[in-house]
Amino acid sequence: MSIKEWPEDERPREKLLRQGPATLSDAELLAIFLRTGVNGLSAVDLSRQLLQQFGSLRALLGADQGAFCHAHGLGPAKYAQLQAVLEMGKRHLAEQLQRGDALTSPQLTRDYLQAQLREVFALLLLDNQHRVIQFVELFYGTLDSASVWPREIVQIALKHNAAAVILAHNHPSGVAEPSRADRQITDRILAALALIDIRVLDHLVIGDGITVSFAERGWL
């Protein structure tokens, strides 16, 4: 049965317009994006199949072009459409902050960084009002003491005349709990930036839907 044959109050698009996007399941949201299903599968059924195949909505949205296009019911056109939607979301968040909004909310910071991060150690540079100056992706791959150089972070902070920074990196495993190496590297960066009077406001470790804040744990 196609979605058009469903009762109106069960159709994803009508449900979104009536109740808002937060009320929809991942499969229903994805179905609105896909618009149509394939032979034998409605858009919602196809969405459920894709979510099961990729493991989660996050994994599907973060899939590379090859993996995405190889999936049944997807292809280059859908991949291009998805990348455009994701980029618009990133730019919307960036514009909210870069218009001068202060980073006073930990959740706002997390939303901004979660939209940016792809297995990377990043630096958010802030002015003395905690407004965003620049978002810089620094190091890629596994975070360890050999890959992160406090001196380089100091140079970048000075170059942009930052008054404060927020550090962030994600754990590809999806587990957000900081490792001993995470804490040791943070301490080194904290000490290096303290010498030039630049504050580290937070270090965010981002996992699969969970973010750990060093500041909230009292580690800074």
Swiss-Prot record:
Zn(2+) binds at residues 169, 171, 182. Disulfide bonds: none annotated. Pfam families: RadC, UPF0758_N. InterPro entries: MPN (IPR037518), RadC_JAB (IPR025657), RuvA_2-like (IPR010994), UPF0758 (IPR001405), UPF0758_CS (IPR020891), UPF0758_N (IPR046778). GO terms for biological process: proteolysis. Keywords: Hydrolase, Metal-binding, Metalloprotease, Protease, Zinc. Residues 95-220 form the MPN domain. The keyword Oxidoreductase does not apply. Belongs to the UPF0758 family. This is UPF0758 protein ASA_4229. One of its GO terms (molecular function) is metallopeptidase activity. A motif (JAMM motif) lies at residues 169-182.
